[in-house]
């Protein structure tokens, strides 16, 4: 499928918004490759800290096990550190999983303004909750890279093995229905105001995430075009 991409910018500074299972883990690597940008998945950053049992990781695990969110200061500093020290972030970044609240969005804007790198776009992946439940309960993740698969919708070439490294895939422990419903309730309550925030600042764009991944990708590129 050829398409005119002349309207798509060469670099991007954006936020990817969407509930768990909306396809952020599928689309973010496409964006990273297309724009030579870094993918800052705050969930992956935190899980990495938890796995390494750093002081931050131990503190974060306690908070996450209670179904709560890690403090804004910790998250902002973690992102700032990546933007400053990660060479992959020089050409742009895709923030995934942050911000989740209006105060976070305001603090993020403030920090990015100080760096002279304000957000250009906030793309929301929109999808129905019931479809999400069926999608996410079959989700498989490659811990080292964050690549995600699905038992039904996007299976790996070899069962329970990562396509690229051949390493084992895991099913996240919080990917069961009850935990998911709790996460969705939290998502809607806390994250939907973010959409209104970015609509007001004029950088929001919405994409129907129930479509096939290739169609979603095409729609994301259209959103990123300089209007």
From Swiss-Prot:
CDD domains: ADK. The keyword Ribosomal protein does not apply. Pfam families: ADK, ADK_lid. Transmembrane segments: none annotated. Belongs to the adenylate kinase family. AK2 subfamily. Monomer. This is Adenylate kinase. It comes from Kluyveromyces lactis (strain ATCC 8585 / CBS 2359 / DSM 70799 / NBRC 1267 / NRRL Y-1140 / WM37) (Yeast).
